[in-house]
Amino acid sequence: MELDNNAHSVFLMHYHLVLVVKYRRKVFDDHISDRAKEIFEYISPKYNITLQEWNHDKDYVHILFKAHPNTEISKLINTYKSASSRLLKKEFPQIRQKLWKEHF
């Protein structure tokens, strides 16, 4: 186990994030999950995040990542959820049909 360090401390901070699709709808397949992972990998360096593991099922995603103590996890999650939602709905229009019904 290799520890990370900065000027005054040594640390090893792992986070396990589980993101669940609204109403547990069956949205994720391999292609959509791969694109969501690409988006996470694009955003993560800006927050000093290193992706360790990525798993998915049809209605959720498990993300294991390493972070630094000064990382604002809430801002990372907010940024990722906003960007991934916008981009995935744009690139995969079938997602909108699974999340929204035509009646009210």
Pin down the residues of each PLM region:
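Basic nucleic-acid-binding interfaces
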Residues: 1-104
